[in-house]
Amino acid sequence: MRHWKAATAGALLLAGCSNASVDQPTATKSVEASAEPQGDNILHITWGGIAEADQGEARRHWSTWTINLVDGGPEYGWLSEKGAAFPHTLNFELAGTGKVRAVALDNRFAPVVREDGSMSQTAEGSPVRRFALLGSTVGPDGPFETLVAGEAKADARTLIKLPKEASARWLRLRIDSNWKGGGATRLSDLAVFGELDQRGSAGEADVSGVYAHEYGPIALRQSGQDLRGCYNNGLGTLRGTVFGRILRLAWFSKEEGSIGSATLVAANGKLYGFWYRPEDKMGSPWNAVRETTLTDADLGACRAALYPPA
């Protein structure tokens, strides 16, 4: 988290923490706007949508993780392992029960240059071809029913409307083939259009706790809708708000002289989401697993950020 001016911190927190608008991510809009179905992309991270890690994801670079499919843009995406056999199964969860009307798969290869000069994606992998979207209102393990099946265009965005509106909270994308006929499969973005019963529903009772992340722990303290936090053992601080299970945060590191924003979703004892710098054209995943409570943790350098003097 580097290179940003502190003067924009307040603007970040007020404007939100995604690289797209809250109501409708601009990156998911079709070239033919009239072709868009009625409703919002309710799978987008700013609507509380999450993506579960696929089998074997921990062995891959984060730029290929499933969470990248809910950020609203094609800059980062998902990439399967080379030797994985079809079908590939990717699991998602909405913030509440949704009325699903359409799905859009984005197979465009649209990498951007990262701050270290590398590209956000490699040309490895063949685009998704045949697929099915399944849904459940019962739980993450189903039972699932097929909502729609179809064929995604290679290197393009494909929007397919459901035969009829369907209710679902847990979604499963089954990928049956790619355009090469084998090898690694890639997908840049997934959008699910419809309406949620309650956008702010399904929130954690309290997101306070210490969450384990590979670069260092994330400590959060919730008081009403207000959030205070600390990351990487005191390297930086967090301030923000919570709405249902959606966390909108600004982060600041005095040591690094940097500032930015984050959009996270607290669900299933985990944090899902991204941190951003304003010059970024995409966010970087900031997924973490709840490890302990604040009471049971040695907060060390984070204590002052979590419990500031009155």
Where does each model-flagged region fall?
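Bacterial N-terminal signal peptides
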Residues: A7-G16
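Bacterial signal peptide processing site
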Residues: S18-A20
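Low-complexity, Pro/Thr/Ser/Gly/Ala-rich linker/spacer regions in secreted
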Residues: V31-L43, G194-S208, L294-P309
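Predominantly extracellular/luminal regions of secreted and cell-surface proteins
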Residues: A33-V70
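Aromatic, loop-rich ligand-recognition surfaces of beta-strand-rich domains
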Residues: V70-F144, A154-A202
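Solvent-exposed strand-loop boundary residues in beta-sheet-rich modules
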Residues: F109, T137-P140, W179, L196, ...
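Central antiparallel beta-sheet cores of small beta-barrel/beta-sandwich binding domains
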Residues: G200-S284, G300-P309
